[in-house]
Design a protein with these regions (language model features):
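Glycine-/proline-rich flexible loop or hinge segments
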Residues: 1, 48-53, 81-89
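Alpha-helix boundary/N-cap detector
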Residues: 2-6, 10, 95, 117, ...
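N-terminal cationic leader/targeting segments used for protein routing and processing
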Residues: 3, 21, 154-158
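Zn2+-dependent metallopeptidase catalytic core
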Residues: 4-22
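Active-site scaffold of zinc-dependent metalloenzymes
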Residues: 16-61, 73-77
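Long, well-structured alpha-helical subdomains associated
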Residues: 58-61, 105-158
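Post-HEXXH active-site segment of zinc metalloproteases
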Residues: 60, 76-106
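Short alpha-helical catalytic segment bearing the HExxH-like zincin motif
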Residues: 61-69
Length: 158
């Protein structure tokens, strides 16, 4: 098994273990998209207690999505004010997704989850996703800096 594949295996085990500590299930669905039309979603304990990711896509896209949804779990766990505010304000939702994407890309790098050959493609995919969020959300103006996420920095592979 090459290094990237081992890192991926370790990351899935790590995420599953962290979720289990909070009574949240990791649900990997054998489809290209999740039931709601997206690639994945995080449901808080009051709303289903699961982190779902469609696994029927490229491995790079799968791990990008898993990292993104895992960051939402970390935001929920830390009771992040931006995470809470994003439910009620479209501008905060865009800001949240921007911070989430930045953190997900950082996790992908820290864990070595994307081979060199796929890194540019994942960054492009991230930019396209943020553009689509911006287009879907009316009158979005982000005027704040991303909040520091202390917990995200400590997610490095040990």
């Amino acid at each position: 098994m090459n290094t990237v594949e081992q890192n991926r295996k370790d990351f899935v085990a790590f995420v599953r273990k962290q979720l289990n500590k909070c009574g949240i299930k990791l649900n990997l669905r054998a489809s290209k998209k999740h039931l709601d039309g997206d690639y994945g979603m995080f449901c808080e304990p009051d709303h289903g207690a699961e982190l779902c990711v469609a696994s029927g896509m490229s491995r790079d896209k799968f791990f990008h999505t898993l990292a993104h949804e895992y960051v939402h779990f970390l935001q929920w766990f830390a009771d992040d004010p931006l995470y809470r505010a994003s439910r009620d304000d479209a501008r905060d939702y865009y800001a949240l997704e921007k911070v989430t994407e930045e953190s997900a890309l950082e996790i992908l790098d820290q864990w070595g989850l994307i081979p060199e050959s796929g890194q540019d493609r994942i960054r492009e995919s991230s930019e396209k996703y943020l553009c689509s969020v911006f287009v879907r959300v009316p009158s979005v103006r982000v005027s704040r800096k991303p909040l520091p996420h202390k917990g995200i920095k400590n997610v490095k592979k040990t």
